[in-house]
Amino acid sequence: MAIKLSLVAGGGTVAPVDRDENCAPAKAGVQTGEAESLATPDRALRATGPLPAQGYWRLPNAGQPTLSELFAASPRDGGWAGFLLGQLDRQRPLLWVQDRMAIIESGRVHPPGLDVGELIHVEARDPKAVLWAMEEGLRCAAIGAVIGEIWGDPAVLDFTATRRLAVAAERHGVAAFLVRLGGTANLSGARLRWRVGSAPSLPHPLNPRAPGLATWRAELFRARGSMPGTWRLADEADGLHLVAEPVDRTLDEAGFKQVG
């Protein structure tokens, strides 16, 4: 299933190019605001594997779509993208919205392994247009998740705006992710707030000179209904896995003793 939309960011125009019966009520809702969503709360996020104690990692509040806010470890650190895509349901298309400054500073979307036929990409004129496009996209039951990238700390991105996104995500059963590039963690209505950055790759199992699996360090610093924490994660075929942090210590501290 592929859904393509032609959208004039900031102009309030949404035109469906390929009609899809599963999204028809939601498309009508984008234009009239009167349609009811058909989404169910457990469809937008994937909970992978068994419990975390067995080495797998499950997203806090998995199965309960809401608004998550992600802060990049540095303005041009793209590690958050791998962390985010490792959690999402790839069975439905993603709506990915970027404002102009986010594109200029960090580039357009190019996620390896993501079928471009399942990606709806919107280049928004400004942060206000990003918020508008995200809120409208959350009304579509056929969308797997809505991702929005905003650069800096625009005045329009206040508590009320983030609260609106959180309510829309929970009402319609579609997960929303607001990515803050070069932003400050001010007051927000997001239920989950993260700091995510790239971490050293794992050792390659066959070639010690080659990079292994990519890893990310994710800090959950605010959460409703979940304990904050920090994890190092690797994306494997069946989901995100916990990875042990490297320890910098002497051989004596590690328990090794000199013999002979």
Which stretches of residues belong to each language-model region?
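A contiguous pocket-lining binding segment that forms or flanks enzyme active sites
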Residues: 150-206
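Detector for small/aliphatic-rich hydrophobic stretches
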Residues: 1-96, 100, 107, 116-117, ...
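Long, charge-dense
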Residues: 97-158, 162
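A short acidic, amphipathic alpha-helical/loop segment
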Residues: 80-86, 133-134, 161-164
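C-terminal regions of RecA-like/P-loop NTPase motor modules
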Residues: 2, 226-260
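Structural motif
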Residues: 69-71, 95, 144-149, 177
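A conserved mid-domain beta-alpha-beta active-site/ligand-binding segment of alpha/beta enzyme cores
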Residues: 206-226
